[in-house]
Amino acid sequence: MKQNIYITGLGLYTPLGYGKDDTLKKLRQGESGLKVKSLWEGIPPCLIGELPEVSFNQYIDWKEPFRPTPYSQLFILGCLDAIKDAQIDEKDLESTGCIMETCLGPSESVNDYMKELLFKRKGIISPMKFTRTVSNTALGDVSRYFKLKGPSCILLTESSVSYAYDLIKLGMADIIICSAIDVVTQEVILLKGHDGKLLYNAHDIDKIHEDTNHGFDAWASGCCAVVLESEESLQRRGTKAYARLVSCQERLEGDSVCAPPQITNDYKQFSGNMFYASTLFGLAVASLSIKNGESYHIGEKSHKVKSQEVVVYSKRDGDMSSLFIIDNK
């Protein structure tokens, strides 16, 4: 069983821009990437995050006859940024896996497929177009392009980090790209608008944090990738790590961390970036806790954190929570 697991790479494609460096720079400047705008005809402007245009061909030499969907392109670009940041070469990629997490999946591709099937083609359509509607098509595109041969799978609204942590801990992989991706659709915005959950003024962004009972939210598309790696692989490759992932849990429960977030690290540090990004992107204080050198509890259990460790706890829909402890020395 592997003893130590490290975070060695970050990849980001968000409304703040493409690339880890550009994104974190804007985060430190206090930007969120959210704007009051309408992305679809007939839908009123609301607070939303729009991805900046990035030339897929500029970064990716795609040789297959069928071009990836915009959903897959977003995923490929996010993983590319993480792979470059972790300095993973072609030889190491052969034993690297990828765990993809999504909530909405390729909803836009499904909508386009059904419109063409029902209204344009009248029931006659190429089976190749159906493959673009399957969630794990994006995972296949990434695996083929980067020639990944390690364990890979797709998760729906679960933690890719938790699964990757277990795979490395059990010795089933040395490097795993953990990723989360979603592309917001007009159907989601229409539904949330009908339920009164959207915001229509940029100055109301604080309501996302303050009024957690009402459930105000701002939606955006994006992809985030984190590279987890065993200590043996890290030493063999001679690369540096951001931090050590000490512990990782996921569970169904209803309790939240008892104390509000306290952060003492500079924002240039990994834990500071995580906290700053999470609050800007709309995670409420009750949903996230990052703590240094203090006790915390979940349910009936109490734990003591070492002075150099950071606890990250996030709670998502359905009372599914994730707990990560990061050594930030």
Task: Tell me the role of every PLM-derived stretch.
Residues 2-13, 18-47, 192-263, 299, ...:
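Condensing-enzyme catalytic core mediating Claisen C-C bond formation in acyl metabolism
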Residues 10, 101-103, 133, 146, ...:
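Fold-independent oxyanion-binding glycine-rich loops
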Residues 109-111, 188-190, 323-324:
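Short, well-ordered secondary-structure micro-motifs
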Residues 59-80, 130-131, 151-162, 208-225, ...:
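Active-site pocket-shaping loop/turn-to-helix segments
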Residues 6-7, 28-141, 145-146, 154, ...:
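Conserved beta-ketoacyl condensing-enzyme motif
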Residues 75-85, 141-180, 221-237, 274-299:
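Active-site-proximal alpha-helical scaffold in enzymes
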Residues 174-196, 201-210, 214-215, 248-255, ...:
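Acyl-CoA/ACP chain-elongation machinery
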